[in-house]
């Protein structure tokens, strides 16, 4: 139990409440406060099951924290390895191939992934859209001279046409124009 002493101001001659008026001397005002440790449902500290401070309220987890990199299986834009991508580029295709070089920690890459998902819905069977994680495929990204993220490669099914490369977040309309007019 902790006792906290509070002094009253000398200019206050009239009591503020019936409780304060029952006190004999203004300087004898004591506020009693009990401080009890709160039991936490989990603890991340190695010092035991006590929270960081006796006044700290425990947090409740709404869902488990994410563990590692996670790519959903129901995404239309599939993650490929370097070897799978090279086989796809060398194979026969009738539709353009869009390759997204991204990183999971990159904010613009996350925004680009949303736009590419919308693009994959619109060009369902008229384009193949894949992505490559530059953290997992570092050497391949270096060989492809990926300097900024996100980097997109638009590869035409016609081998005589050069690939179109973009760096940074580009609007959805620009991707439409490249696929419709340049491929």
Swiss-Prot record:
Protein name, entry field: Thioredoxin-like protein CITRX, chloroplastic
EC number: 1.8.-.-
Source organism of this protein record: Arabidopsis thaliana (Mouse-ear cress)
Short name of one Pfam family: Thioredoxin
Enzyme class (EC, first level): oxidoreductase
Gene that this polypeptide is encoded by: CITRX
Superkingdom of this protein's organism: Eukaryota
BP terms from Gene Ontology: cell redox homeostasis; plastid organization
Location in or out of the cell: Plastid, Chloroplast
């Amino acid at each position: 139990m902790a006792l906290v002493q509070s002094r009253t101001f000398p200019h206050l001659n009239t009591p503020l409440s019936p409780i304060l008026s029952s006190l004999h001397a203004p300087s004898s005002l004591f506020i009693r406060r009990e401080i009890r440790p709160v039991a936490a449902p989990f603890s991340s500290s190695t010092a035991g099951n006590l929270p960081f401070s006796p006044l700290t309220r425990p947090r409740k987890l709404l869902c488990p924290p994410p563990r590692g990199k996670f790519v959903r299986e129901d995404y239309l834009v599939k993650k490929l390895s370097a070897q799978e991508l090279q086989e796809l580029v060398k194979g026969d295709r009738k539709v353009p191939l869009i390759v997204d070089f991204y990183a999971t920690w990159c904010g613009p890459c996350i925004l680009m992934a949303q736009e590419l998902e919308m693009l994959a819905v619109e060009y369902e069977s008229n384009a193949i859209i894949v992505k490559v994680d530059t953290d997992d495929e570092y050497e391949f990204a270096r060989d492809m001279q990926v300097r900024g993220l996100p980097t997109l490669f638009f590869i035409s099914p016609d081998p005589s046409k050069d690939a179109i490369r973009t760096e940074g977040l580009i609007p959805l309309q620009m991707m439409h124009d490249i696929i419709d007019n340049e491929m």
